[in-house]
């Protein structure tokens, strides 16, 4: 019963949001919220997760709860008694709390800053470290310490262990049970010495865990349970400042960053066997994307991958500690090398000035040589949104000799906040003297290579497993020094077999130290000998020996195709009409076939036209006959109606004995009257006279009939 009840309760609780004030069902998916003491994240619905990400969770759901305090600087109300708002404030040294906005305005965190658990373990990325890089660079410049703030998504993340100093290892009591020693070193030695010491003390417990995707939320400090206890993942910066030398070399790992200059970078290369990590090329500009606005979700498609080398940023006018952060890159297309350069929309909205009208704003950029260029940054409205372009880039592309396929890299120079526009040629290959130190200091990587190369003296074979796109292409080619050639070992007989005598000349044979050689008066032909005895086709040999024609490279002399027999237009003698050469015969035959084809098409057209005309005539005849029949019926119908309705003499004369004799004579006037009704008005008088005569005759006949009847009686 207990197991069934526990299962039902767990299944029921899994359907609701973790927030007790919310009663929504989690039908499709859930979103992570704050971290629990066990190290897991709570599951929230979309509404609660959105409120938590915006920092308004307690303002919405915990208005009547206790534990509200005010910021000592601005007076903002902060809920101090809730785990959901633990990342919204910091503890002051003299007591009280302060919101993060006021804390960033008053002071910048130094290298000796020991953060509280509420500040570290529950801090979202967008709230804690949005503007710390600017304050950090300004505060450390006075102390002459080259240090950058911690990054949340750094490719090099150190895994430190919590030393269990008691029987209980709960996270709720860090002061008495365990202590986090992450950032405690002297200011004079700097952050690099501190990291080196921490690495030497804890070399058994750290490992590299890169985060390739910047869009996925990663906490600042991640707790993991392992065989050695609870492990703490503390981020380490990746950018190193430029030294005060006036010149700063551009490196292949980061744009204008000195590679392997800090102990952290050297240790990172040692951990990976001198080679780059698989995600190092994708996370070189992670620091720049942390400062982007929250609404822009940039994708790693246009992240700077591998920068270019052997270029100098000339900055001799002033000596300052500057850090160049790569932002994004764009591979030039055929249209980009013209008047304008199309920029990725997400990155243009995130890193470049915001535009309110289509005309745009002028944008000043600096090339790797220190020269400033002025472009026009604008956008075009389209159905799918805006299309951001840089206009006026033709002089820049022509000066640097950029072509389609090359890559332009947009970077930011801090703290001056200048925009740097670099480039990387697609056709430039790295030679062996400029190879990475990882290739020379990791011989075991060559043994694991999947590519087999011939080992010859003076040739350095590169590693077969490269981690970036440019290194993968370079690993497929051998790196050979200038002037070094592959040695080919051959015997005397094999070497003699590659030397052939010139045509139509017989070589003289000389014996030197029991070896027979052939002497040639002219330069021999170097090549593999052919088997002449195996071929018996003389025609094929004649075709091979014959030179090619200028009209068609693959055709030989004597070819009778239509391409080879014709002379070029306007060149060659004119032929008579009765000429019977191959060219004229071919042209006459083609002309005859063309005329026959044309006549056939003309006859087909005429036949089709005649058939169509006959069909139309037959249709017209049928239509005319149908109309005539309809007219005949229309004229005949009124006569039948008058005869049937107006004249019925048989009913009146049925009782008379002489009715049979008189019906015929009596019907005649009726027929005459019917006929007279259809006559024209001009003949009406004639018809009236005829009617009178008929009436007279009718009277006489009736009188005769009466007399006969009376006489019979």
UniProtKB/Swiss-Prot annotation:
Compositionally biased tracts (Low complexity): 676-688, 701-713
Molecular functions (GO terms): DNA binding; DNA-binding transcription factor activity
Single biological process term from Gene Ontology: leaf development
Disordered as annotated region, ranges: 459-478, 616-713
The keyword Nucleus belongs to this UniProt entry's keyword annotation: yes
Main function: May be involved in plant development.
Protein name, per record: B3 domain-containing transcription factor VAL3
Organism per entry: Arabidopsis thaliana (Mouse-ear cress)
